[in-house]
Amino acid sequence: MDCVESYLSGDNSDESPVMHTWFSPSPSPSDSSSSPSSSASSSIGRNSDDGEKSSEDGGDDAGENEVESPYKGPLEMMESLEQVLPVRKGISKYYSGKSKSFTNLTAEAASALTSSSSMKDLAKPENPYSRRRRNLLCHQIWENNKTTPRGGISKKHVMSSSRSALTLAMAVAAGVMTGEGSSSGGDSSPGSSPTTSGSPPRQLHHHQHQMKKLPPLYPRSQGSFGNLTSSQSSLGFCAWRSFSVADFPRCFPATASGIGFNDS
């Protein structure tokens, strides 16, 4: 600073102070290195030094405050882990006796099997609700097995029963026709023997004439009941057809006249 003051005093007073500051000599590197106060007074250096010191102090404090477990043995069992691990008290109380190792479970199972009342302890306790539920389930399964049809056996049985009922109805109708024909033949006079001898051809012709008036047979019924139709035609039966109420007087004229129908 002495050289700076002498420099300012030796200059003319007309010069501006800016020129004095601009041409003022800068400190040498030796002076800056020799003065430790300048390096310590810088804001950047002071903050960095303080941060390093605070981090070192914090590490020392963390090392001093570290908690060590008193247990020094091997962590092989669940009980030792429960003692060492930092578990919350609420959770540890809730899972107390539940989260155990499999070795303890096998030991308890072996002890239960060796005891006298092992089966009673291991069996699930039964209450009226569970007993009622089991009975209802068995009853429902039994009813489903009874009502469920098994394959095509039941369908075949139903078809055979319907055929037998239809055959019985046709036989009864044919019996009524033959009975009326025999009664009409018995009422005829004994002198008319050629007429009675010629009655079967007349009945056959009348039956063929009625067959022409009926609707045609279905192709399926002709193929399946062809033999049955031929055998029944010789006995006076009507063919296998789907009849209606209007066709009834044509098929059985004698019965229809007795009931009250008229031939159309």
Curated annotation (Swiss-Prot):
The keyword Nucleus applies. Coiled coil: none annotated. Residues 1-76, 178-225 are annotated as: Disordered. GO terms for molecular function: kinase activity. Its main location: nucleus. Residues 47-56 have a biased composition (Basic and acidic residues). The keyword Transmembrane helix does not apply. Residues 203-212 have a biased composition (Basic residues). Residues 29-43, 179-201 have a biased composition (Low complexity). Keywords: Kinase, Nucleus, Stress response, Transferase. It is found in: Nucleus. Residues 57-67 have a biased composition (Acidic residues). One of its GO terms (cellular component) is nucleus. Transmembrane segments: none annotated. One of its GO terms (biological process) is response to oxidative stress. InterPro entries: OxStress_Response_Reg. Promotes slightly the tolerance to zinc (Zn) and to oxidizing chemicals (e.g. diamide). This is Protein OXIDATIVE STRESS 3 LIKE 1. It comes from Arabidopsis thaliana (Mouse-ear cress).
